[in-house]
Amino acid sequence: MAAALLPTLSPPVSRAAAAFLLLLRAPAKPFSSLRPPQTLRRFLTSTSSSSPVTPPPALRPLSTVAASSSTTARAAPARRDLLMLGIETSCDDTAAAVVRGDGEILSQVVSSQADLLARYGGVAPKMAEEAHALVIDQVVQKALDDAKLSGSDLSAVAVTVGPGLSLCLRVGVHKARQVAKSFGLPIVGVHHMEAHALVSRLVNKDLDFPFLGLLISGGHNLLVLAHSLGQYVQLGTTIDDAIGEAYDKSARWLGLDMRKGGGPALEELALHGDPNAVNFRVPMRQHKDCNFSYAGLKTQVRLAIESKNLCTDDIPISSASEEDRQSRANIAASFQRVAVLHLEERCQRAVEWALKIEPSIEYFVVSGGVASNKYVRTRLNQIAENNGLQLVCPPPSLCTDNGVMIAWTGIEHFVAGRFEDPPAANEPDDMQYELRPRWPLGEEYSEGRSVARSLKTARVHPSLTSMIQGSLQK
């Protein structure tokens, strides 16, 4: 289907932290007393170069939410009475949820693209976008129906604005603006990786800042020190492939059923293998930092499969001989042991760095899709215990991409007064906004800077934390 021009996003900044809300190329400015500046810049797209400029409404603190255009102003509810709709479409899951301000989950709906993943051997952005567009209306409506609410009952809408796949992000953003415009609701733009970190605060009410976070998924490996809401230090990241990508590719090469997800399929197969059968090398041991690399380990897996003459492309594991199945299980178990050992070594160094910066840290938060892996949790729990920290992992349903984490992060920032006013009633559907597909969460720790040539830096937006710091300096 033809892709319509949908909103892209670029977050403004407040004095307390960056408001990842909707703006376009406007210089960030701090609040002045209780009256915020005009931080939202929008323009109407047109074939004409002389398109009229529409002045935006001001970003306002929570206590002074006002309406745009013909929408009706709403009084600020107490936190427990907040009702946040969260929408997530950053990659291959279409998700929506409604969460109350005190953390009660009223509904959670996820539509998976597992069949597409199996058919195309991974995420095909255009196919994923079309799949999102086909189900987004039903997913959001079911989230409202399951919560026994209508759009008019909501306090605000939170939506993932980055990082992620641009084609996919725009579907969720467009739907969020539709809902917000229809019911006069404020919008909170959410950083996908921050949402993975903060959902643990919904699960564990004792979890407070500062804490160490490990966010592991198909596209991300990220070690961060969370100082406070919106203030993060990046201790380490992946310089090529993330651990989830390595799990998925290895599972595919081993001929596993990808409909249940590559990670879970490989984890299950590894239970039947010898983790020491194949002598895979642990990546990056010569680099004394906290960065990750899984591209080389993927290559080792591929070579191991070829060396054993396993016909994994033609023979799925369900049709393989007993000897063949055992060889595949041994490769899976050996891969998992080394992949997680790489995690352990980097996390141990990150704990040491984090405690040097913030000696008061008590929690080690692990989230993201790979955090659902029981072997990963067991090994990282040992790291936490060895360093006197408490491991906090959300339940598996909140580790993978979901609407709950988006809604909860939206609540945290909405309460802090960081949101955009409802879209104007006359806002056209073909407006264009800047999305943030490459959006760092925090500033890099000086000791963690990598000199690896493959470190991805091109077309990266300024980090959320750098925007906060810039606003405070002004």
Please place each PLM-identified region on the residue numbering.
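Acidic, glycine-enriched active-site microenvironments
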Residues: 2-474
